[in-house]
Amino acid sequence: MPNIIEITDFAAPELDIYARLTEGQLLNRHEPDKGIFIAESPKVIERALDAGCVPISMLMEKKHVERQAREIIRRCGDIPVYAAEFDVLTQLTGFHLTRGMLCAMYRPPLPGTEEICAGARRIAVLENVMNPTNIGAISVSYTHLLRAAKSY
């Protein structure tokens, strides 16, 4: 049974995950097996659950609790579900929530080198990348570079 909690106090430490911790603090570099990530839409939350990620809590617009989020909340089990009106959430997070729903989850264990490299023809090592958007940009640039090299 989910624990639906209406947000009235933004100072609650339980909301730090969503409002006050940096990406680096969520990642927990010193103990990566205890790292956390934020899934930022119903589709991403569902995919993370399908992949076996373990939810910690959810933050969403109040209107989604009995509608769009009902099945996701059921799948998450007995976790806190923080809910508030749209304007209240915007004040808390400082930005417009993607599809009105966030879910804090434990990061899955990192795979070993052997598992990553098994069957790979090429491997790119990207160090100190904090924003996944940068990985996409690097991948696109690499693809264009390969195409250009083949045309010569």
Language model regions located:
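Short, aromatic/basic amphipathic alpha-helical patches
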Residues: R67-D78
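Acidic/glycine-rich phosphate/pyrophosphate-binding loops and surrounding catalytic core
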Residues: H96-A120
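The conserved cystathionine-beta-synthase
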Residues: P132-S141
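Glycine/small-residue-rich loop that forms an oxyanion/phosphate-binding "nest" at active or ligand-binding sites
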Residues: T90
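Conserved small/polar residues in nucleotide/adenosyl-binding loops
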Residues: T143-H144, A148
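Short, glycine-rich nucleotide/cofactor-binding loops
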Residues: P32-I38, I123-T133
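A glycine-rich helix N-cap at a beta->alpha junction
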Residues: I79-A83
